[in-house]
C-alpha cells in the first residue's frame, strides 16, 4: 500500500495490492465525497512523540470478523477522517515509516467516534529498514565508487526480476552467506523459481560476479555497520493524501498445505514492521484483475493449487467465490492474463488443461458463473 500513496487519482482504480495478498480500490477522498447520513464518522489526529503533527500517515480500520480494510491519510494538520462506517468493533492502526505503529480497539456507535495516536520514533535503523519498500532499499544501496555502482546495477538487473528487492534485503548475511545464496539462485529457473539441480550450468552473469556481489551485499546487509544510506520517501500530501484505499483480504487457495491464520496468510503486508511477505506462507498466485459490470472484482491464479482457477470477490461483503477448472493430476488449471469484453464476458489464458495443448482460452460469464 505504501507504493500507492503518491497517486493523485481520486476516482476508482482497480489493482492488485502489491506485497499484500489482496485487491485494492482507490475511491474519492473523504473531504470531497458526498455527505452520507447513515453510519459512524471516525476521525482523529496523529502526532509524534515530540508533539509534532504528522502529515501523510496511513490510518487503517478493519471491522471485527471482516476481511475489508479501509485506509485514509492524515492532512497537513495531522487530522484524519474516514467515510462513515457501520457501527461495531474495529481494529484501528496508524503507520508511518520511521515510527512504531499505533494500534487501538475502537467501538463505534452513534454518529461519530474519535481515536488519536501518538507514534514513537524508531531509534534503531534495523527496525526502520523492515518497513522500507523495495524502491527504498535499492535507493539506499551505495553507489559512491565505480565498483559499488557496478555491483548495484548487477544486483538490480539480476536479482529483482521475480521478487521485490525488499524481500532479499530485509535479511542480513555475511559474505559466505550471500555467496551461498548466489550459488543456489544461479541454478534456479528464471520465472518459475524451481531449483534445477547441481548439474545445471549456472547463470553466467551471476556466476561471473558472484564473489564481488557477495562482498557488496555483505557490506550493505551484513552483520557489521551498513554502507546503505537510508532516505525514506516523503509521505503523501495534498491531493495524494485525500485518497481512500479499500483492501480486500484473499484467503489462501490451499490453507491445509500452508501456514495460515484462519485461512489467511500469516503475514500479508498489513503491518510494515513485519517485513515483506514471503510466498512460502501461501500468499502468492494472484495475477490479473478485472472489475465486472456489477462492480465485483475477478482475478486469476497462476500458481498450482487444488481449488482456484479464477475467482470473484464481492466488493460489498469481501466474500471470495472460487471457480475450479479441472487441470492436470487433480489440480485446478492455473490462469494468467485476464480481460473483459464489451458484453461483460471475462476471458483468461489457461495453462494445464487436460485436453492438451500449451495453453487454452477460458471464457467465464459473470452472470451465471459458468465457463467454457
Where do the PLM segments sit?
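Structural motif
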Residues: 43-54
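Extracellular beta-sheet/turn segments enriched in Thr/Pro/Gly and aliphatic residues
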Residues: 34, 108-131
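Short, acidic Ser/Thr/Gly-rich low-complexity loop/linker segments typical of extracellular
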Residues: 63-79
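Short Pro-Gly-centered beta-turn/loop motif in secreted/extracellular proteins
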Residues: 52-55, 81-89, 97
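A short, solvent-exposed loop/turn motif at the edges and junctions
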Residues: 65-67, 89, 93-105
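The canonical Cys-X-X-Cys-His
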Residues: 155-166, 213
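Conserved beta-propeller blade signature
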Residues: 296-299, 345-348
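Residue-level detector of Asp-centered blade-edge/turn motifs that repeat once per structural unit
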Residues: 291-294, 340-343
Amino acid at each position: 500500500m505504501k507504493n500507492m500513496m503518491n497517486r493523485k487519482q481520486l476516482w476508482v482504480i482497480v489493482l492488485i495490492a502489491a506485497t499484500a495478498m489482496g485487491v485494492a480500490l482507490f475511491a474519492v477522498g473523504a473531504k470531497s465525497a458526498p455527505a452520507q447520513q447513515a453510519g459512524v464518522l471516525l476521525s482523529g489526529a496523529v502526532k509524534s512523540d515530540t508533539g509534532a503533527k504528522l502529515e501523510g500517515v496511513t490510518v487503517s480500520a478493519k471491522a471485527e470478523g471482516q476481511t475489508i480494510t479501509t485506509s485514509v491519510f492524515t492532512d497537513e494538520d495531522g487530522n484524519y477522517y474516514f467515510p462513515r462506517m457501520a457501527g461495531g468493533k474495529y481494529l484501528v492502526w496508524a503507520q508511518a515509516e520511521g515510527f512504531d505503529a499505533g494500534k487501538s480497539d475502537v467501538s463505534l456507535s452513534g454518529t461519530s467516534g474519535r481515536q488519536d495516536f501518538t507514534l514513537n520514533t524508531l531509534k534503531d535503523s534495523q527496525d526502520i529498514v523492515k518497513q522500507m519498500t523495495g524502491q527504498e532499499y535499492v535507493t539506499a544501496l551505495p553507489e559512491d565508487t565505480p565498483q559499488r555502482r557496478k555491483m548495484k546495477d548487477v544486483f538490480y538487473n539480476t536479482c529483482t526480476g521475480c521478487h521485490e528487492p525488499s524481500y532479499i534485503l530485509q535479511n542480513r548475511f555475511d559474505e559466505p552467506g550471500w555467496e551461498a545464496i548466489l550459488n543456489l539462485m544461479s541454478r534456479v529457473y528464471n520465472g518459475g523459481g524451481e531449483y534445477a539441480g547441481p548439474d545445471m550450468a549456472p547463470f553466467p552473469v551471476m556466476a561471473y560476479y558472484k564473489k564481488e556481489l557477495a562482498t557488496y551485499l555483505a557490506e550493505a546487509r551484513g552483520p557489521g555497520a551498513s554502507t546503505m544510506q537510508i532516505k525514506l520517501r516523503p509521505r503523501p500530501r495534498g491531493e495524494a493524501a485525500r485518497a481512500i484505499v479499500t483492501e480486500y483480504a484473499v484467503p489462501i487457495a490451499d490453507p491445509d498445505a500452508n501456514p495460515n491464520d484462519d485461512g489467511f496468510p500469516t503475514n500479508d503486508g498489513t503491518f510494515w514492521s513485519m517485513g515483506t511477505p514471503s510466498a512460502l506462507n501461501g500468499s502468492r498466485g494472484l495475477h490479473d484483475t478485472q472489475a465486472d459490470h456489477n462492480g465485483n472484482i475477478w482475478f486469476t491464479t497462476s500458481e498450482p493449487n487444488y481449488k482456484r482457477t479464477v475467482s470473484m470477490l464481492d466488493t460489498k461483503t469481501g466474500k471470495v467465490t472460487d471457480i475450479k477448472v479441472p487441470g492436470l493430476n487433480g489440480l485446478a488449471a492455473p490462469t494468467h492474463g485476464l480481460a473483459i469484453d464489451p458484453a461483460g464476458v471475462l476471458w483468461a489464458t489457461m495453462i494445464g488443461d487436460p485436453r492438451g495443448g500449451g495453453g487454452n482460452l477460458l471464457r467465464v460469464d459473470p452472470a451465471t458463473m459458468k465457463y467454457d
